[in-house]
A protein has these predicted regions:
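A short, charged, Gly/Pro-tolerant segment at domain boundaries
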Residues: 263-290
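HTH-adjacent hinge/linker in prokaryotic transcriptional regulators
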Residues: 2-6, 15-18, 22, 32-36, ...
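Short, Lys/Arg-enriched, disordered terminal segments
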Residues: 1-11, 285-290
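Glycine-rich phosphate/diphosphate-binding loops that line cofactor/substrate pockets in enzymes
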Residues: 120-132
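Glycine-rich phosphate-binding loops that contact phosphosugars or nucleotide phosphates
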Residues: 130-248, 252-261
Length: 290
């Protein structure tokens, strides 16, 4: 993918102005750095104006510089080591107003997720979950928190949910080896993508299960063999993976399947409320507590 974009820029070099050629050469040689530069900073770095950078972006086929920047970021996200992420964070964030910067970026991720995820694809994924004999959920490393959140609520909606855990490939396959054609397998992973999750999806697909991938782009290795692709933006804001948009998407999926099973969910919660009350699970708001 990176080669395609850089190749296209290189191929179109002859039709560029002198200043635009400077930008093109810099991006080809330093695309990992250029991906996180503003148009102004990139212009200053190569010695051209900000407007020249903007014109360059449109010249190479993008609506504007932000779209070119996003494309470059997409190309390198899975390549950055933790050390490189820390360096990028330092350059992007600085030490001031971090709260505002991070929350603003997360808001943008949710907005883009809503724009890019089709409602039809989302509803189809929800329907397949409702129809499943068994529901397997897998998320590894930082995605484990997402898988646990989904499993917690799905267990209150369905009797047939299996959260796949384990610190090794052997443990993982021991838990999913019975997955079959009437089951749904949900794999969750974001850059840097988990090899175990990809292998598990391959296995589930070979066994005839319906595969739902929750990931960041159609270029993700999870997308290749899934039946339903649910996309959530997790563009790197720092060395910490942003799970805000993925969690919002999963939250919506939980609500969607819950609304399709309102009667059953209502009965389940009525029983749970009795158990919670009988076994004093939650703190009660009592008056005159000293």
């Amino acid at each position: 993918m990176a080669k395609d974009l850089l190749h296209n820029i290189s191929e179109g070099m002859s039709g560029l102005s002198k200043g635009q050629k400077l930008i093109a050469r810099y991006i080809i040689e330093n695309y990992d750095k250029a991906a996180f530069m503003t148009a102004s900073k990139l212009g200053n770095t190569v010695g051209v104006s900000e407007s020249t950078v903007v014109r360059f972006a449109t010249e190479v086929g993008f609506e504007g510089y932000p779209q070119l920047q996003r494309a470059l970021q997409e190309l390198i996200r899975n390549r950055l080591t933790a050390v490189q992420r820390m360096e990028v964070t330092s350059e992007q964030m600085g030490e001031h107003d971090i709260l505002s910067k991070v929350l603003t970026m997360d808001i943008e991720k949710i907005r883009r997720t809503l724009e890019e995820q089709s409602n039809e694809g989302f509803e189809a994924a929800a329907d397949s979950i409702i129809a499943a004999k068994n529901i397997y959920i897998l998320g590894i490393r930082s995605s484990a928190a997402l898988a646990q959140f989904m499993s917690f609520y799905f267990n209150q909606i369905f009797p047939n949910v299996r959260l796949v855990t384990g610190s090794s490939a052997s443990e993982m396959f021991e838990q999913i080896f019975r997955v079959g054609k009437d089951d749904v397998f949900i794999g969750i992973s974001f850059p840097r993508y988990s090899k175990r999750t990809v292998k598990a999806i391959d296995y589930a697909k070979e066994r005839g299960a319906t595969v739902i991938a929750i990931t960041d782009s159609a270029g993700s290795p999870l997308a290749a063999k899934c039946d339903h692709l649910l996309l959530a933006r997790s563009d790197m804001a720092s060395f910490v993976d942003s799970l805000v948009a993925p969690l919002s998407l999963i939250n919506a999926l939980i609500v969607a399947v819950g609304m399709r099973r309102q009667k059953e969910v209502g009965e389940t919660y009525a029983q749970l409320e009795k158990i919670w009350d009988e076994y004093d699970v939650y703190e009660k708001n009592e008056e005159n507590i000293v």
